[in-house]
């Protein structure tokens, strides 16, 4: 799809999103019951959870971050923002690796126009890059869930946007962790990064997109946007963020993970770690 075709597709999605938001938004969603009356009303509270495990090499880390930075300053993002019921979103950005290794790069910020979007993009861009051991998607999801508790915002929707290039291999099992997040009324979307060809003895896997679909994502409108080519990295990240702000999902629809039997073992990451290291450091519950 060319750039013009992509813009046309996104514009169509945003038009549909405006109608959907007007029809489906309620003044007091259930998850807002415990929020302070002084909290600011926004269309979505969005947590961006970014994998920085050692399997993420610099050629993956840089476009991963750049994709979010460019998305926040794009005209498609601004259009999605304007179409919302409140024309505002709240966003925070953190990096994750092992079970207890999470670092907030940018705390909760309000985006309500180009100026605040630029400020957020600049804040993310200014953070130094880092890498760390292990891949605990479950640890990242658990941490992300807690961030909503004191965000200071009333979101009509709450979304975790998790990106990574491997399966869970540390901390609690990912499925019960995911289900715990979904019970709280939070949607999980995925950005599986599939740039490397899997080789024996590595932690890379061929069907990471299927793993994300069946074991990681869930909730109303949950979807994945796989990245298989470096040239598509920024475009895919931008499209995903625009869809999340608009409250829509791409076609064909991905059925939320909780409503279908997994097509892949959701403990494959733990199994791969055990095969490689003989169970050393395998601390999942």
Regions found by a protein language model. Name each.
Residues 225-285:
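C-terminal "exit" segments of structured domains
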Residues 40-107, 116-163, 190-203, 207, ...:
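Von Willebrand factor
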Residues 81, 167-214:
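VWA/integrin I-like adhesion module and closely mimicked acidic/polar interface patches used
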Residues 84-123, 200-213:
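Short beta-strand-loop
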Residues 51-52, 144, 156-170, 216:
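DG-centered beta-turn motif at the end of beta-strands
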Residues 193-251:
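Von Willebrand factor A/integrin I-like adhesion domains
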Residues 22-47, 53-62, 154, 182:
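Acidic, polar low-complexity linker/tail segments
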